[in-house]
Regions:
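Predominantly a Rossmann-like dinucleotide-binding segment in NAD(P)-dependent oxidoreductases
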Residues: 1-43, 166
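Active-site rim elements
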Residues: 3-6, 37-38, 116-120, 140-142
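Hydrophobic alpha-helical segments typical of transmembrane helices
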Residues: 14-17, 128-132
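NAD(P)-dinucleotide binding in Rossmann-like oxidoreductases
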Residues: 41-46, 56-128, 145
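C-terminal helix-rich "cap/oligomerization" subdomain common to oxidoreductases
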Residues: 56, 131-167
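Short beta-strand scaffold segments in enzyme catalytic cores
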Residues: 51-53
Length: 167
């Protein structure tokens, strides 16, 4: 069996989110790597990948994706996102607040006023999924434009094809 690779599989979400959060319509790949650390019985499998991108506005992005969830983690996958700005940063903990709280959906941020934490579980919702479903059915572009989706797909394919195999 074959598949598109880990960068197209789960990395595509990180690339799309980078374009959205940074306000970029385009980016270029700086570096990408993939590896197979724990599945030697499946030589074509990739259980690790990482990518570095630079957006057209100079915003930079690094992400790592893997299929290496430890058995002791209370959920499948970690799902953290870090957004670093010039005056602070935000950390999104989507699925678990590791070793602290069994609830999901925590936002941490640091700015000139201090350190902050907000439990947003049950407060924010998931409007994107409903909007995307309606976009597919109604041929609208509410969740994202087709151009945005295709650019994210193009960037993940380029990252996958150009990735160095490190293991």
């Amino acid at each position: 069996e074959t598949y598109s690779g880990i960068l197209c599989d789960i990395g595509s979400h990180q690339i799309e989110q980078f374009l959205y959060y940074s306000g970029c319509d385009n980016a270029r790949g700086v570096n990408s790597q993939v590896g197979n650390y724990c599945h030697s019985q499946y030589p074509e499998m990739e259980d690790f990948g990482e990518v570095s991108l630079v957006g057209e506005n100079g915003a930079s992005n690094y992400f790592r994706v893997d299929w290496l969830t430890p058995d002791g983690l209370s959920t499948w996958g970690d799902g953290r996102t870090f957004i670093l700005g010039t005056k602070g940063y935000i950390e999104l903990r989507k699925y678990v607040d590791v070793a602290r709280d069994q609830t999901k959906d925590h936002v941490y941020w640091v700015d000139e006023k201090g350190e902050h934490r907000e439990d947003v579980s049950g407060k924010v919702g998931y409007p994107f999924f409903q909007e995307l479903l309606h976009d597919c059915i109604d041929r609208t572009e509410t969740a994202m434009t087709q151009e945005h989706a295709l650019k994210a797909g193009e960037l993940c394919v380029i990252a996958q094809i150009s990735a160095q195999k490190i293991k």
